[in-house]
Amino acid sequence: MISYGMGEHSIIEIADALASGLPVEELTYIAGTVFKCRDLSRVYDPIILPSYEEVKVNKKVYADSFAIQYQNTDPFSARPMAESYGTKGYIIQNPPALPLTQEEMDDVYALPYTEKVHPMYEKLGGIPALEEIKFSLTSNRGCFGGCNFCALTFHQGRILQTRSHESLIEEATRMTNDPEFKGYIHDVGGPTADFRQPSCQKQLTKGVCKNKPVSYTHLRAHETCADL
């Protein structure tokens, strides 16, 4: 079993299910997970993707499969997807987990992270790229832009999730206690095109409109999905 995306919801659900005595083979229902099965008898209304044998030899089929997957990254509208692997059965990807609420986002970033690299990297001289982001603040997740060059949708989704200002200030205050802190924060933001709020009034209950890339956002700023 694989937990994909950001993982907070699915990891907890997996742990609770295993703690209750369920075998891992029974955990076929958890959003934000991928699992292997022999047949599709326990998978409700799956989208059948091109087989592994097809996508590995045909670029057009590979692109077609990717397009189908891209259209099924919204937890409110996505369906399970099945890809066959010859005689070995199927790999099933369940729909993504629901996005975190602001309270859940705040809880995640309130945890006592060390902000240090794993000791295994010390003998290699650390991770140079960490120096640029160590004193940065993640304010949000997800992006509804839908830019053609970006695959962020596949692990953070298009539904914007934000932290409260209080949470950001608390983390910034903790940074000042780090002996390596030089007095300035490198960046406050996330993987979006400076989006901070949901793309429309229905995003958090109905999902994000399909086929509405970032170029649509400048048309009429206060429209809802229903208007479009």
Model-predicted regions and their roles:
Residues H9-I12, T101, F144-N148, Q156-I159, ...:
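Flexible loop/turn segments at secondary-structure boundaries
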Residues A17-S20, F154, S164, S199-S215:
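Short secondary-structure boundary/capping segments
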Residues F154-Y184:
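Conserved alpha-helical substructure of the radical SAM core
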Residues H218-A221, C225-D227:
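Single conserved hydrophobic/aromatic residue that forms the stacking wall/gate
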Residues M1-G86:
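Glycine-rich beta-alpha loop elements in corrinoid/cobalamin-binding modules
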Residues T176, G183-G207:
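Terminal amphipathic helices with adjacent charged low-complexity linkers/tails
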Residues L124-A151, Y184:
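N-terminal pre-triad scaffold of radical SAM enzymes
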Residues V61-S136:
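N-terminal [4Fe-4S]-dependent radical SAM core
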